[in-house]
Amino acid sequence: MEELEKDKIERNEEMSEEVKGEGPPSELEQSEEVVEEKIETEVEQKKEPSLEEIVEELRKKLEEKEKEAKEYLDIAQRIKAEFDNYRKRTEKEKAEMISYGQEQVIIELLPVIDNFERALANEGDYNSLREGLELIYRQFKKVLDKFEVREIEAEGQMFDPYKHHALAQEEVEGKQPNEIIEVFQKGYYLKDKVIRPSLVKVAK
């Protein structure tokens, strides 16, 4: 009787052990399962795209680049057209300004020519002719002044190759070397620009 009771107790203990083994998974087991699922998910996400997908992606990128290139080309063409129009407009304005400037000079010189003709037509004496020529000279000088044309100072000045051209040299007592001692032809400025240098003789 005692042996039967002992066997029963042993079987109950074994069943208890089995029941314990079949209980809920431990935290370690749960963590391992989560890690395995995460790895499987990442592997699926990192799956290499197919050839068709690669081709489609490249086609889309190519279309985008072609669209950008067309936009840049349109911009470049518009800028070129605007620049061409600007260049033509400025060239026309420049030509008109030159033409207008020439016209103004001619208009200012016409009275000088008129007075020359009157002086030449005058059959009076030499003094009258001289007075007429002096009048014309003063009138012509006023025209030059109006257009900011000035004589270049030369005689008594030191030679300056930017304003003077030396045609001759001569030893002159009391004169410094390269001092201008004679002017063969006057030079002129237009504003601050030398439009004709003076032709001079300088001392040695």
Swiss-Prot record:
GO biological process: protein folding
Annotated coiled-coil segments of the chain: none
PROSITE patterns recorded: GRPE
Superkingdom classification of source: Bacteria
Pfam families, per database record: GrpE (PF01025)
Gene Ontology annotations for the cellular component aspect, listed alphabetically: cytoplasm
Main location per the UniProt record: cytoplasm
Keyword entries, A-Z: Chaperone, Cytoplasm, Stress response
InterPro entries in alphabetical order: GrpE (IPR000740), GrpE_coiled_coil (IPR013805), GrpE_head (IPR009012)
Disordered as annotated region, ranges: 1-46
UniProt subcellular location: Cytoplasm
A single MF term (Gene Ontology): protein-folding chaperone binding
Regions of compositional bias (Basic and acidic residues) in chain numbering: 1-21, 36-46
Keyword Chaperone among record annotations: yes
Segments traversing the membrane: none
Primary role: Participates actively in the response to hyperosmotic and heat shock by preventing the aggregation of stress-denatured proteins, in association with DnaK and GrpE. It is the nucleotide exchange factor for DnaK and may function as a thermosensor. Unfolded proteins bind initially to DnaJ; upon interaction with the DnaJ-bound protein, DnaK hydrolyzes its bound ATP, resulting in the formation of a stable complex. GrpE releases ADP from DnaK; ATP binding to DnaK triggers the release of the substrate protein, thus completing the reaction cycle.
Assembly with partners or alone: Homodimer.
PANTHER family: GRPE PROTEIN, GRPE PROTEIN HOMOLOG, MITOCHONDRIAL
Family named by the database record: Belongs to the GrpE family.
Protein name, as recorded: Protein GrpE
Organism: Caldanaerobacter subterraneus subsp. tengcongensis (strain DSM 15242 / JCM 11007 / NBRC 100824 / MB4) (Thermoanaerobacter tengcongensis)
Gene: grpE
